């Protein structure tokens, strides 16, 4: 079993690397990148061996790996567990949804009662994936599948449906609108992927990528809660203005995809992410498991140099989210911005737990990027 988080409330050093090395080829490489299996137990912590993961890069081809990464950073604190007896029910009313009255600005999440409950759900989902499916080539259409691969796709589709059904209860319980939206989008895209397996074509894979990126973002948000970096850095970030409108409250058990057609900001969003990847090349080479108190002069300079780059990136995402005209897109953008700025605020006194802030931010930005691709296909 993958190592889970064990502590909350104070910043602790993560027990070994959970982040795989980035794949090459940019955000949307035309080439196929083989998928890599994830070890069941994280290797021992080593200095210099683990590099930052720009989530958008790895998510080009990694679906199985991403789910496993989600398990690696899922909180296990039973104090945040879902109340017993709270099963999935029918169409809920506003009173059944804890975040129904959340119409304020999106901010760094310091507490969430669903963080512990997601672990068993995603662990079971990951266990349904065979090595054959993890290493599949998503560019192969259904007509090219072997009988074994066809069976594996169908098995994973069933696992996605099951996970989506279970996550629906978490969407009702979280008190945070943005967290509910992440759960809802996992549900919507996981089911869409499963629905399309009988008629699978290569673009169908983007639906799975959105689902697992949403799950991955949730897990990093919960990791920041569990290791205390969210609580430590959230007070350092000023909230943006409250939105003028939020997405209509629907049934979290039957959510719709937030992008079913290309959004006008999608092209620029992708360009901004590509530019950010290029501009942070040196920073991505640094070891996230070294605290600022132990940085060399070179490491300190690299981190100081990345601050204005990250601030510019955050401002660009904020403006694009606002210009999207899509309340859910805007919330995802704003949440990415808040976690990015929290990371920036952490740099002068950086500890390894702060890496979860940066990883949550890039996963959120990547989620919107892949959703744009899925909508265009």
UniProtKB/Swiss-Prot annotation:
It is found in: Cell inner membrane. Keywords: Cell inner membrane, Cell membrane, Membrane, Transmembrane, Transmembrane helix. Disruption phenotype: Loss of DNA conjugation when disrupted in recipient strain; strain still secretes EsxB. The chain crosses the membrane at residues 53-73. The keyword Cell inner membrane applies. It comes from the Bacteria. Residues 1-46, 77-107 are annotated as: Disordered. One of its GO terms (cellular component) is plasma membrane. It is a single-pass membrane protein. The keyword Transmembrane applies. May be involved in the ESX-1 / type VII specialized secretion system (T7SS), which exports several proteins including EsxA and EsxB. Involved in DNA conjugation in the recipient strain. In the well characterized mc(2)155 strain this gene not present. This is Uncharacterized protein D806_0077.1. It comes from Mycolicibacterium smegmatis (strain MKD8) (Mycobacterium smegmatis). The lineage of its organism: Bacteria, Bacillati, Actinomycetota, Actinomycetes, Mycobacteriales.
């Amino acid at each position: 079993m993958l190592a889970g988080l064990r502590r909350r409330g104070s910043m602790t050093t993560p027990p070994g690397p959970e982040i795989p090395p980035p794949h090459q080829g940019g955000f949307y490489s035309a080439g196929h990148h083989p998928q890599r299996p994830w070890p069941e137990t994280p290797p021992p912590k080593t200095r210099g061996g683990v590099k930052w993961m720009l989530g958008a890069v790895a998510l080009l081809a990694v679906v199985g790996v991403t789910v496993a990464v989600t398990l690696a950073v899922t909180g296990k604190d039973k104090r945040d567990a879902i109340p017993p007896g709270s099963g999935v029910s029918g169409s809920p009313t506003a009173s059944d949804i804890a975040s129904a009255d959340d119409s304020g600005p999106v901010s760094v999440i310091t507490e969430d009662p669903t963080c512990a409950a997601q672990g068993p759900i995603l662990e079971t989902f990951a266990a349904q994936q065979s090595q054959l499916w993890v290493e599949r080539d998503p560019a192969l259409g259904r007509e090219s599948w072997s009988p074994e691969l066809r069976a594996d796709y169908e098995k994973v589709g069933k696992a996605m449906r099951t996970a989506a059904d279970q996550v629906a209860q978490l969407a009702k319980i979280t008190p945070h609108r943005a967290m509910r939206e992440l759960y809802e989008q996992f549900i919507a895209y996981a089911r869409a992927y499963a629905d399309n397996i009988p008629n699978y074509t290569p673009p169908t894979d983007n639906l799975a990528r959105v689902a697992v990126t949403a799950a991955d973002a949730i897990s990093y948000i919960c990791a920041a809660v569990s290791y205390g970096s969210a609580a430590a850095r959230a007070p350092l970030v000023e909230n943006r203005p409250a939105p003028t409108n939020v997405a209509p409250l629907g049934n979290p058990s039957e959510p719709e995809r937030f992008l079913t057609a290309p959004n006008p900001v999608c092209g620029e969003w992708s360009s901004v992410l590509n530019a950010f990847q290029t501009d942070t090349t040196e920073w991505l080479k640094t070891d996230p498991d070294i605290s600022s108190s132990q940085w060399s002069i070179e490491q300190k300079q690299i981190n100081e140099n990345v601050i204005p780059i990250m601030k510019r990136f955050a401002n660009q995402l904020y403006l694009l989210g606002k210009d999207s005209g899509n309340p859910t897109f805007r919330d995802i953008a704003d949440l990415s911005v808040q976690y990015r700025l929290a990371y920036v605020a952490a740099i002068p006194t950086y500890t390894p737990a702060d890496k979860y802030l940066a990883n949550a931010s890039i996963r959120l930005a990547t989620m919107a990027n892949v959703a744009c691709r899925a909508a265009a296909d």
